[in-house]
Amino acid sequence: IQMESGDTPDFALWPQPGAVVDAATRGYLTPLEDLGIDLDQYQNDFSSYLVGLGVVDGVIYGGANAANLKSIVWYQPAEFDARGYSVPATWDEMIALADQIVADGMNPFCFGMYSNGASGWLATDWMEDIMLRTGDGVDSYDKWVTNELKFSDPIVKNAATLLSQIMHTEDYVVGGTDAIVSTYFGNAQDPM
C-alpha cells in the first residue's frame, strides 16, 4: 500500500520472493546495478539460486538476506527410544506414527501460528516446504511464488491437503486445532 501511494521506502524486506517480482514488475524497485552494487561480486558471494530470487526480466532487483527452515519436524530422540518409535522416512510413515502417538495418549504436533497482525505466515512456511517436496520440486515452487502456478492447480491443492492432514486433525495438535491460531509462534515448541 505504501508503494502504491507513491511513498516508496529506500529499503524493503519481504518474507516471500514473489513480492519482489510483483514490486519490480510494477516499477517500484530500482535495479541493484543502478545503486552502485558490484553485480559480479554479488553473484560471486551468493548462490545462483539465491541471486535468482531477486531477478525480474534479467535485471537484479534484490536478493535473499536470510534462508530459514521453519517447517522442520523436531522430535526428542530419547522419547522415541523409550517408546520404541522409529523416525519416519515418508509422509505416510509420519501419519502412521502420529496415529500411534495419539493412540498412546499424546499429541504428536505442536503448532503456533499467532503472530499479532502477521498471523498466517507460519502456515505459508509449511506450505512452501510441502510444495518443494511433493510437486515438481523447485520448478513448481518457483512457478508458484511468481504466480505462474495458481492456488487452484492440483499440485498446490495437494500440498494444502497434506498440510491440512496434520493441522486439522484435532488429536494431532497440542490444545486441539483451535489452539494453532491462539498459540504464539515463539511458544509453539514449549510442550516439547
Model-based region annotation:
Residues 30-46, 86, 113, 132-158:
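Short, solvent-exposed loop/beta-turn-alpha elements that line the ligand-binding surface or hinge
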